[in-house]
């Protein structure tokens, strides 16, 4: 489930559904440009990127009790994560960095400046055939109203080991995801 309204609706029928909190609801900082910032931050601050609210037991219990979530989905995003002890899926090698209600392709075509975005009520469908490319070292692309990136650390791990090592060798930790989800955009 990637929508709070849908979670509320299907959470009314716990005997019929086993809910999984999707990657869009599992909020965390995911941006390939963070690696440049990380080199300038003290280690104590970069370690904070490894966790989010799902690492708090009370939050997991509240999600399970109130909405019926029993599994959580994470995205590989180029830096270590600390996974909670609940059932966890890891999506790899692509991840979504952000989504906007505005269309950068529309702004580029109409305004010749992708920064001049505003809400559109009728979509001409530019994104059906076009995408934004970012500098190669970022491994990012802009498609539809979202930015996506490729986790290079996962690809390097695949070259030297198995899919399991790449997916679950995220960090020296006791808890690892129990399922890998391959996404190819």
Name every feature range the model reports, one short phrase each:
Residues 1-185:
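Active-site pocket-lining/capping segments in soluble small-molecule metabolic enzymes
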């Amino acid at each position: 489930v990637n929508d709070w309204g849908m979670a509320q609706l299907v959470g009314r029928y716990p005997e019929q559904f086993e809910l999984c909190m999707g990657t869009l609801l599992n909020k965390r900082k995911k941006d390939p440009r963070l690696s440049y910032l990380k080199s300038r931050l003290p280690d104590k601050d970069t370690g904070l990127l490894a966790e989010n609210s799902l690492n708090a037991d009370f939050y997991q219990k509240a999600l399970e009790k109130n909405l019926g979530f029993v599994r959580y989905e994470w995205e590989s995003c180029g830096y270590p994560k600390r996974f909670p002890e609940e059932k966890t899926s890891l999506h790899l090698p692509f991840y979504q960095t952000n989504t906007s209600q505005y269309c950068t392709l529309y702004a580029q075509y109409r305004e010749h400046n992708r920064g001049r975005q505003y809400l559109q009520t009728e979509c001409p469908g530019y994104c059906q055939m076009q995408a934004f490319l970012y500098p190669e070292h970022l491994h990012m692309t802009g498609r539809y109203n979202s930015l996506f990136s490729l986790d290079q650390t996962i690809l390097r791990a695949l070259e030297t080991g198995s899919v399991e090592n790449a997916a679950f060798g995220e960090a020296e930790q006791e808890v690892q995801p129990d399922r890998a989800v391959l996404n190819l955009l």
